């Protein structure tokens, strides 16, 4: 489009990508190439002057921070875990879940004065939570099924993302405390927000309108 600068948007691969595409389509951006992507990772929309890039969640903020892309669509869990520089501009209202502290049903987690061991895929989130409580804990980073840690005696509890709670229940775990809510967010590179202010604000406004309409429809 004449006079408008190209905007590059990084989408988190998977469920967030699919939900984000629905909103962009509603906002008038043709995402047919992304929908029928095959093995492609980069998509050019000449009409809207937008490029979409598909990346894994932890990499979205890296691309945004370094200015390789202007906008990122990523879960709040990733924002909380990574210490990056960006503007968080929109709560997109999908991908809703929560960070929770959980452990064995019959455990006395809150009793005793021993230093508790906490297993998690999100050490920074867990560390921040217990720091606010003034509680000294040992954080153990886990890459796989974190539910195994208390079952096998590696940890006293876990900090993890919970959606329905069914996985916890099936493994004999219960939620001790909900830490915070999570959903998909739109973030913007700090320099891009200044250099491409008009183009980016146009996208933000279009997406915001669609979010508002979706929220009205489900009330």
From Swiss-Prot:
One of the Pfam families matching this protein, by short name: HisG
UniProt cross-references to NCBIfam families, sorted A to Z: hisG
GO molecular function: ATP binding; ATP phosphoribosyltransferase activity
Protein name as it appears in the record: ATP phosphoribosyltransferase
InterPro entries for this protein: ATP_PRibTrfase_cat (IPR013820), ATP_PRibTrfase_CS (IPR018198), ATP_PRibTrfase_HisG (IPR001348), ATP_PRibTrfase_HisG_short (IPR024893)
Cellular component GO terms held in the UniProt record: cytoplasm
Keywords of this entry: Amino-acid biosynthesis, ATP-binding, Cytoplasm, Glycosyltransferase, Histidine biosynthesis, Nucleotide-binding, Transferase
Compartments reported by the entry: Cytoplasm
Domain topic, free-text comment: Lacks the C-terminal regulatory region which is replaced by HisZ.
Top-level class of the enzyme under EC nomenclature: transferase
Database matches in Gene3D superfamilies: Periplasmic binding protein-like II
SUPFAM superfamilies (UniProt xref): Periplasmic binding protein-like II
One record GO biological process: L-histidine biosynthetic process
Pathway where this protein functions: Amino-acid biosynthesis; L-histidine biosynthesis; L-histidine from 5-phospho-alpha-D-ribose 1-diphosphate: step 1/9
Top-level lineage group: Bacteria
Description of how the protein assembles with itself and partners: Heteromultimer composed of HisG and HisZ subunits.
Protein role: Catalyzes the condensation of ATP and 5-phosphoribose 1-diphosphate to form N'-(5'-phosphoribosyl)-ATP (PR-ATP). Has a crucial role in the pathway because the rate of histidine biosynthesis seems to be controlled primarily by regulation of HisG enzymatic activity.
CDD domains, per database record: PBP2_HisGs
Reactions it catalyzes: 1-(5-phospho-beta-D-ribosyl)-ATP + diphosphate = 5-phospho-alpha-D-ribose 1-diphosphate + ATP
UniProt-listed Enzyme Commission number(s): 2.4.2.17
Family, similarity comment: Belongs to the ATP phosphoribosyltransferase family. Short subfamily.
């Amino acid at each position: 489009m004449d006079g408008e600068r190209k905007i590059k948007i990084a989408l988190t691969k998977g469920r967030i990508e699919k939900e984000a595409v629905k909103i962009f389509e509603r906002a008038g951006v043709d995402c047919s190439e992304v929908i029928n992507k095959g093995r492609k990772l980069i998509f050019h929309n000449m009409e809207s002057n937008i490029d979409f890039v598909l990346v894994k969640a932890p990499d979205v903020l890296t691309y945004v921070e370094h200015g390789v892309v202007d906008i990122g669509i990523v879960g709040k869990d990733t924002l909380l875990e990574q210490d990056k520089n960006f503007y968080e501009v929109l709560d997109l209202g999908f991908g809703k879940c929560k960070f929770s502290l959980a452990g064995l049903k019959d455990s006395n987690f809150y009793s005793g004065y021993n230093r508790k061991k906490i297993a998690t895929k999100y050490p920074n989130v867990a560390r921040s939570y217990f720091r606010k409580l003034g509680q000294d804990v040992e954080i153990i980073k886990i890459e796989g099924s974190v539910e195994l840690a208390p079952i096998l005696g590696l940890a006293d509890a876990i900090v993890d993302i919970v959606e329905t709670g069914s996985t916890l229940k099936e493994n004999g775990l219960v939620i001790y405390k909900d830490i915070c809510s999570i959903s998909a967010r739109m973030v913007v590179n700090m320099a891009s927000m200044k250099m491409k202010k008009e183009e980016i604000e146009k996208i933000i406004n279009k997406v915001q309108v669609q979010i508002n309409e979706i929220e009205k429809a489900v009330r």
